[in-house]
């Protein structure tokens, strides 16, 4: 979309940065609304890149080795994009929203390490998953929240 202005949803392609494996993002309509459905406005503020699992893994491993900083796979994508795409006079900020231990198997295999899992994350990961099926209705959602 960013290159052509044409939105072509497609099946997701699985990668080690699984939150970025979205071929038909549910929030795309919100982005269009924010930018008045203008491709020109969107592409003036937003750019995009794609990386293979090998590139993501290389970034994660090399950053750990050279900077002693442990990225998660999603952070590795953002960090690589900033490293490759910023102009010399630009400053970038890379924020991660997940602890690398959430991707322990992947991170351990790429770094040769053993990521420690923080107690709060362990308790969350070991906790019981709770879900409730409901219709895609605001009224039903609101009623559920008011009951709980």
Question: Language-model features: where?
Answer:
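PLP-dependent amino-acid enzyme catalytic core
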Residues: 1-148
């Amino acid at each position: 979309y960013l290159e052509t202005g044409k939105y072509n949803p497609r099946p997701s392609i699985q990668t080690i940065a699984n939150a970025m494996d979205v071929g038909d993002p549910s929030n795309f309509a919100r982005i269009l609304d924010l930018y008045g459905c203008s491709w020109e406005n969107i592409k003036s503020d937003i750019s995009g890149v794609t990386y293979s699992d090998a590139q993501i893994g290389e970034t994660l491993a090399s950053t750990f080795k050279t900077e002693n900083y442990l990225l998660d796979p999603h952070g590795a994508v953002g960090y690589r994009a900033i490293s490759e795409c910023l102009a010399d006079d630009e400053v970038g900020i890379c924020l991660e929203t997940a602890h690398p231990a959430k991707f322990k198997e992947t991170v351990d295999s790429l770094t040769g390490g053993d990521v420690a899992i923080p107690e709060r994350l362990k308790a969350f990961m070991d906790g019981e998953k709770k879900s409730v099926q409901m219709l895609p209705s605001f009224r039903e959602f609101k009623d559920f929240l008011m009951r709980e």
